[in-house]
Amino acid sequence: PLARKKMRSPLTSAESFQPQPAVARSDYHHILMVLQGMGIMLERAWNSFVNMHEEDLRHIFLAALNTHFVEQASGETFNSEGKTDILIKHENGGIVFVAECKVWTGPMSLCDAIDQVLSYLTWRESKAAIILFNRDRQIATVLNAVPKTVAEHPQWKRTEQSLLDLPSTFLYTIKHPSDENIEVSVSILVFNLPFRK
């Protein structure tokens, strides 16, 4: 037999309201610096990584992030509408950053990556990144295509000055798909990791 449940009044907290965690611009910059440093290391030793796929490369970036954010970065973690490649949680459990790793196959692959990363954000999350790997094209072609492709995306709001000092990094303000008044910072970091020829 099923037991009847008694409705209980919710317990009220004696503590004051704690707002949702948000990433300070300096922390977002730190996350991007870790990703950039790891990506540059991969480029310098590209021959060691030529046969790795997105998922394998993601694990390398996760390892680097977890040296800075102990047990806060995870991979293939469910948030909102799916599993994001990289997710960083605040110590209180709130999500503060998500990222997707993608191989560039043309402008459409970047548009799809933007849609994908946005689908993993609730209205509370405002910092994201796309780690874009160039595997078989001239890097200048990819770098020239990124700004044009993003500016044509329907959620694009404006182009910002990148927080990083490399011509292979970009920062955009994107409209959140659930509310165009909510702004999301999306950084795109491009790394050249060719396949062995």
Pin down the residues of each PLM region.
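The feature marks a conserved, polyanion-engaging helical scaffold used by nucleic-acid processing enzymes
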Residues: 1-66, 70
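Short, well-structured alpha-helical interface segments that form or flank functional binding sites
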Residues: 30, 52, 56, 60, ...
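Conserved catalytic cores of phosphodiester-cleaving nucleases, focusing on short active-site segments
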Residues: 61, 86-88, 96-103, 120
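Active-site metal-binding core of divalent-cation-utilizing nuclease and nuclease-like domains
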Residues: 62, 67-93, 107-109, 175-180
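Short, flexible loop/turn elements at secondary-structure junctions
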Residues: 90-92, 102-105, 190-192
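Hydrophobic/aromatic beta-strand patches that form the interior of the parallel beta-sheet core
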Residues: 97-99, 129-131, 187-189
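Catalytic cores of nucleic-acid endonucleases
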Residues: 103-154
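Domain-level recognition of nuclease-like catalytic cores that cleave nucleotide substrates
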Residues: 135-197
